[in-house]
Regions:
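Nucleotide-activated chemistry modules centered on ATP-dependent adenylation/adenylyltransferase
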Residues: 1-241
Length: 241
């Protein structure tokens, strides 16, 4: 069902590529906020400890939709009813311009956003609000547990997100940068990387992960060549000289 919903929305997006609507491909997975509470009650656990990374804030994703960033927010993502009303209002305008989004996935999309951004998160603590997120320390910890890594990238960040390689290809092709640029920029601000180091990293990380993209599109039963050609033909935010 989730893959069906993603496919419906991806087909809608490909009909009229819009950087502000890429986020809709990830809306359905936000139901994990609901399932976590269910598991917590079933196992009688008193609190949730999360590992969200404060360096991964990416205002540009909603910004492409026209949603102004809140640089003073103290979470990785926006919460609250008023913010969601504004955000979903902008989405609704985009949907009216492309009615293909008005499909069977709509309720799943809206309810997922509710559980993530509107419903109050009780007994919720983020580990990296109290302990600095350091990439070397994180990678060493993962290696100590023999944690599986991706075959097509050295970075361990975002490798668990099946959509990441696809949407970063879209952002890089249509806008000229990806979430790796914002991630590494935040590390520079925190003094974790020099600008020179960051530029070397993003030069590698922004290369298309075709193997992962093909896996993603195969899972959705969509034609890889046709999808890539559609993205490559889409209007760009920059000019190539």
């Amino acid at each position: 069902k989730k893959r069906r919903n993603i496919k419906l929305n991806l087909k809608a997006w490909l009909a009229k590529p819009d950087l502000g609507m890429i986020n809709i491909l990830m809306a359905g997975d936000k139901h994990f906020f609901r399932h976590i509470q269910t598991v917590r009650h079933e196992t009688d656990i008193s609190l949730n400890v999360w590992g969200m990374n404060p360096l991964e804030v990416t205002h540009f994703k909603a910004g492409f939709l026209g949603f102004a960033p809140d640089f003073a927010m103290d979470q990785v993502f926006n919460t609250g009813l008023s913010g969601q009303v504004r955000y979903q209002g902008l989405r609704a305008k985009a949907m009216l311009k492309n009615p293909r989004y008005l499909n069977r996935s709509l309720w799943d999309t809206l309810s997922g956003e509710y559980y993530r951004s509107v419903k109050e998160q009780a007994d919720f603590y983020n580990l990296f609000d109290y302990w600095p997120w350091d990439e070397v320390e994180v990678d060493n910890t993962l290696d100590s547990y023999n944690w599986e890594r991706a075959e097509d990238t050295k970075s361990t960040w975002r490798i668990g997100d099946g959509t990441a390689a696809f949407y970063n290809y879209v952002y890089y092709t249509m806008a000229g940068f990806t979430e790796y640029d914002t991630f590494r920029s935040n590390q520079i601000r925190e003094g974790q990387l020099s600008r020179e180091q960051a530029l070397l990293l993003v030069a590698e990380e922004n290369q298309p992960r075709y193997q992962n993209i093909k896996w993603y599109l195969d899972a959705l039963d969509m034609d890889f060549d046709r999808v890539i050609k559609t993205i490559n033909r889409a209007p760009r935010k920059y000019q190539v000289e």
